[in-house]
A protein has these predicted regions:
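Gly/Ser/Thr-rich beta-alpha loop segments that engage phosphate groups in nucleotides
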Residues: 10, 48, 78
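Active-site catalytic microenvironments for nucleophilic, acid-base chemistry
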Residues: 32, 212-216, 247
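Alpha-helical cap/lid subdomain in secreted, periplasmic
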Residues: 56-203, 207-226, 234-239
Length: 252
């Protein structure tokens, strides 16, 4: 059994019933993987590379990950919070240094690290045009780290910007926690959240990461199912609404 350990933030985390319809990318990623692949989702709301390490979450991965496993490293949203010293990292120094710590944890166990640039926010200007990206320095820093350390990179940031531009302000709302009052019991007053995802968004952006793995080839592409199998699995996901962790244990 191959395992994907995922270190990230709220855009990836597995959500509980009381926050439905919020859905993390890691929560649905097994839709794209073969049956012998398990996602162990350590992603947690509000975490940066710094706080993830400081809280011992990387240490827990260090204790569990093994040869032939994968470590997906996806940060940026919270590293940029300059007013919060518990989370902030400077993109071209401490952020890059922390990424290398994650990479080294994977490699010392014979596991495969993968860097994933942060998901773009729904940052439309005047309700028409997608604004300047919020994470550009962290994306550049992650790309530099990938090149320096010879680690494959799935550029979710660029791919998600492309999808947001194509869908437009109105069309992209269905992917995010952006909806009117009365649509969901957990949010009777509605929500205008341009960062966190609903099911359709999580599936879409998980698919973009899968595309990046396919392009990387080799052991990374070998994680993924064929297109025909994907369609069958997606029908099952929609039918069952699997808002529970696919991980073998609770990673809270």
């Amino acid at each position: 059994m191959r395992k994907i350990f995922w270190a990230s933030d709220s855009t990836v985390q597995t959500n509980k019933f009381m926050t439905y319809p919020q859905t993390g990318i890691g929560q649905v990623f097994s839709l794209y993987t073969k049956d012998d692949v398990t996602v162990v989702n350590y992603a947690k709301n509000g975490r940066s590379t710094k706080s993830f390490i400081d809280e011992g979450r990387l240490q827990r991965i260090d204790e569990e990950i093994g040869a032939g496993d994968f470590l997906f490293i996806q940060f940026g949203h919270n590293d940029e919070k300059s007013q919060d010293p518990a989370r902030y990292t400077e993109p071209f120094s401490t952020f890059m240094e922390n990424l290398e710590i994650f990479i080294n944890v994977a490699r010392k166990h014979g596991a495969y690290p993968v860097l994933i640039t942060p998901l773009e926010r729904r940052c439309f200007v005047d309700d028409k045009h997608l604004g300047i990206g919020a994470h550009s320095d962290y994306v550049a820093a992650m790309k530099q780290t990938a090149e320096k350390c010879n680690v494959p990179l799935a550029d979710l940031y660029s791919m998600s910007r492309t999808e947001l531009k194509k869908a437009g302000e109105m069309g992209s709302r269905k992917w995010f926690m952006y909806f009117s009052k009365g649509e969901y019991k957990n949010y009777p007053d509605g929500k205008t959240d341009n960062t966190h995802l609903r099911y359709d968004g999580a599936v879409l952006f998980a698919g973009l990461i899968a595309k990046g793995l396919q392009e990387a080839g080799g052991v990374y592409a070998d994680l993924l199912v064929e297109e025909e199998t994907l369609n069958e699995k997606e029908i099952g996901y929609r039918t069952c609404l699997l808002y529970t962790s696919p991980s073998p244990r609770d990673t809270e």
